[in-house]
């Protein structure tokens, strides 16, 4: 495995581990998700550049568009949760209220 691919896979795994272990605030979960999406975007962009195919060149832009939509929906949920509950703790946002 080349050092470039190792760095992107380790960035994805670090984001996944941050998402798994830092489950206290919604904002930290959103930042970990954004880090994972950024590493996926760069990996897919490099993959499409190595293929030299024009049909695969639109794939990173589609992923970036979905990432922006995910970020805007996540921030809207963060604002709504902060207004209704007063904090962004994930324990307060449990829908089952167990």
UniProtKB/Swiss-Prot annotation:
In short, the EC number is 7.1.1.2
Q: Which domain of life is it from?
A: Eukaryota
Q: Name one GO cellular component term.
A: mitochondrial membrane
Q: Which reaction(s) does its UniProt entry say it catalyses?
A: a ubiquinone + NADH + 5 H(+)(in) = a ubiquinol + NAD(+) + 4 H(+)(out)
Against Pfam families, the record matches this protein to: Oxidored_q2
Which subcellular locations apply to this protein? Mitochondrion membrane
Q: Does the keyword Transcription apply?
A: no
Keywords in alphabetical order, please: Electron transport, Membrane, Mitochondrion, NAD, Respiratory chain, Translocase, Transmembrane, Transmembrane helix, Transport, Ubiquinone
* GO MF entries: NADH dehydrogenase (ubiquinone) activity
Q: What class of enzyme is it?
A: translocase
This protein's major location comes to mitochondrion
Look up the record and give one Gene Ontology term from the biological process aspect.
Answer: ATP synthesis coupled electron transport
Q: How does it sit in the membrane?
A: Multi-pass membrane protein
Q: Which residue ranges run through the membrane?
A: 1-21, 26-46, 61-81
What is the annotated role of this protein in its UniProt record? Core subunit of the mitochondrial membrane respiratory chain NADH dehydrogenase (Complex I) which catalyzes electron transfer from NADH through the respiratory chain, using ubiquinone as an electron acceptor. Part of the enzyme membrane arm which is embedded in the lipid bilayer and involved in proton translocation.
User: Which protein family is it in?
Assistant: Belongs to the complex I subunit 4L family.
The identity of this protein, by name, is NADH-ubiquinone oxidoreductase chain 4L
Q: What is the lineage of its organism?
A: Eukaryota, Metazoa, Chordata, Craniata, Vertebrata
């Amino acid at each position: 495995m080349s050092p470039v691919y190792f760095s992107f896979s380790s960035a994805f795994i670090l984001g996944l581990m941050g998402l798994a272990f830092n489950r206290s605030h919604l904002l930290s979960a959103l930042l970990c998700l954004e880090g994972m999406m950024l590493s996926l975007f760069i990996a897919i962009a490099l993959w499409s550049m190595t293929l030299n195919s024009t049909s695969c060149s639109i794939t990173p832009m589609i992923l970036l568009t979905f990432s922006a939509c995910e970020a805007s929906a996540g921030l809207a949920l963060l604002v709504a949760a902060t207004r209704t509950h007063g904090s962004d703790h994930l324990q307060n946002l449990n829908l089952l209220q167990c």
